[in-house]
Amino acid sequence: RWVDPACESQIIKMWIYHIFAIRDSLGGNIQLFGTKKSQTQPEPVETIAAQEHKQSIGNQVMEALGVDSFYNNKWGAMGAEIVNPIGCSDCHDPETMNLHISRPALIEAFQRQGKDITKATPQEMRSLVCAQCHVEYYFKGDGKYLTFPWDKGFTVEDMEAYYDEAGFYDYIHKLSRTPILKAQHPDYEIAQMGIHGQRGVSCADCHMPYKSEGGVKFSDHHIQSPLAMIDRTCQTCHRESEETLRNNVYERQR
């Protein structure tokens, strides 16, 4: 992950003595290659749940072990089972190819909010398949049960209140001795609270825009920044030039 040198020292201080102070973020598929090493350690630290969103292990393994047991298993215990990164079946039903939810944590988060995720519209599903992984989460209790802290809502304040009530924190800062929450990647929550999410724009509308080939219209599965294809993303709604739209984004993200 690229880090602005001007921010590097502050980042190191923020994560001092924590692994994120020194370790670069790897791609999900690359991280899977390290599982053999974990098998050689006497007690591999990381649970399967910690990397569930980086692999397409298949629901059959989770069903065979049970969700609780699956989450609490170590990488080393699974061994050769964990060989594939994200694949078609994570988002698509293998029989019908319809969008579907394969991750229990998302279904359970909806249930705790009194919602039935099976009633989601096709447009909502174009974001919910992403929300299986691109979210804030934590490992609840000694069983390390993968949980989304959405019971009170999607805002930062909502999730902070949830964690305060649960008495949860990720680690104690080594200098300040302050309990710290480390947000993972709350992409879905941020999108839902933004103007695009509020107006019904899905993740796929911007990151997997429609394209046509051979008279067939389908979502582009080369997932990337909307700025790489402004004519098919931003300009389907916004009438400004590509240069203006791109500069607007750069200015807001400075």
Model-predicted regions and their roles:
Residues R1-K37, S56-P85, S89-D205, P209-R254:
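Primarily the internal scaffold of c-type cytochrome electron-transfer domains
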Residues T40-P42:
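Selective for proline/serine-rich intrinsically disordered segments
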Residues A49-Q55:
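Long, hydrophobic/aromatic-enriched structural stretches that serve as scaffold segments
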